[in-house]
Design a protein with these regions (language model features):
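C-terminal regulatory/interaction regions
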Residues: 169, 173, 192-357
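His/Asp/Glu-rich metal-coordinating catalytic cores
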Residues: 1-214, 232-246, 265-269
Length: 357
């Protein structure tokens, strides 16, 4: 979702250098193929721990951080007046999927050197506690796999590759073949397999046309549409409009995602339709089968303790989320209110060694 705007701003931002982690680069290049009229760009690969010198006075270092997709990077901008840290979307996860945990010692070392300004993800700032580990999600999904008697139909975000990997791994454990549905998900899985970010045995993933060769209890379908999108796989399946996957009453449907604000009605209508059709339905309110990629209040506290910034600027979230995040700056670091900037889209914030305004 964050890289999708690039084709639309390319003609407005001059000719900057582009850097991205390997998976991000591959997904971006695939995205840009859909916009043949946009000018071609060259994206340089950057790895966690590497630093790019922009000028004599400016450089950018990136560190590994965890999210719902591999290759997430925290960005540290080194300036003459101090370090500016942007967390990106993040959570702390000791047991991530096909990824390494964030290096807390490296984060602390930057805190020891001094951080002038921290821009931190606020999406989970209204939720108390730690974000759920992907390990917990896999354990709960396995409960469903153990008891499912027919096909498993699992829906999630097309970019939630960690969840796709868990579903593939569990399918292999329980001797199920996997069918991928949804253009974005198919593309993302293909790219991730090529780069080694999704691991599957040679004959695990099959084409929909081969599904009839296996009994229902040996089939898992992973697709898009958990937000109730009208043209996505899950809605067409629920309405009996999907050519390749027709609904059956012994199907088990898994919503492995939370509901994005604004989609509540369409998701509820979709769930109601599935219940009316007689399938078994599991969603995140019944058991922990979805973990947000965004840290909750305890994750945010931990980042603040590690980096100990002079100034805090909550980012990414509704204003209410950023306001709750600001409270943590006061609570954890005893930060005065004037050292916290609550800005809205379009506002310009000026930072000096002594103040933020």
């Amino acid at each position: 979702d964050h890289i999708g705007a690039l084709p639309f701003v390319l003609d407005k931002i001059g000719e900057p250098d582009f850097y991205a982690a390997p998976l991000t680069k591959a997904l971006l290049m695939k995205r840009l193929e859909e916009y043949k009229d946009r000018k071609p760009i060259d994206i340089m690969t950057i790895q966690p721990g590497e630093e790019v010198k922009i000028s004599d006075k400016l450089s950018v270092k990136v560190l590994r951080i965890n999210h719902s997709i591999p290759d997430d990077l925290e960005i540290i901008v080194k300036t003459p007046i101090g370090n500016v840290v942007h967390t990106s979307d993040f959570k702390f996860d000791d047991t991530p999927v096909n990824d390494k945990p964030a290096d807390l010692l490296k984060l602390k070392s930057f805190g020891d050197k001094g951080v002038l300004l921290l821009l931190e993800d606020s999406t989970g700032a209204e939720e108390e506690g730690h974000s759920i580990s992907e390990k917990t999600i896999k354990e709960n999904l396995e409960i469903i796999f153990k008891q499912a008697e027919g096909r498993i139909i699992a829906a999630t975000f097309g970019s939630l590759l960690n969840r796709v990997q868990q579903l593939i791994t569990l399918s292999e454990t329980y001797n199920r073949k996997v069918i991928i549905q949804g253009y974005t998900m198919k593309s993302n899985v293909e790219i991730s397999k090529e780069l080694g970010y999704i691991k599957a045995e040679k004959h695990t993933i099959i084409e929909p046309k081969d599904m009839h060769r296996y009994p229902d209890e040996r089939i898992t379908v992973i697709g898009t549409g958990a937000q109730g999108e009208s043209n996505a796989f899950l809605m067409r399946y629920a309405n009996g409009e999907h050519k390749e996957v027709q609904l059956k009453k012994d199907d088990t449907v898994i919503f492995s995602s939370s509901v994005v604000p604004g989609n509540e009605r369409s998701v509820q209508a979709l769930k109601d339709n599935l219940y009316k059709r007689g399938v078994h339905v599991f969603h995140y309110k019944m058991m922990d089968i979805h973990a947000s990629g965004h840290g909750e209040r305890e994750d945010l506290r931990e980042m603040l303790r590690l980096l100990r910034p002079k100034f805090l600027m909550p980012t990414h979230g509704y204003f209410s989320m950023m306001a709750r995040h600001a409270e943590l700056g006061e609570e954890v670091l005893k930060m005065p209110k004037e050292n916290i900037a609550l800005a809205e889209n379009g506002q310009v914030v000026e930072v000096t060694p002594d103040k933020i305004a």
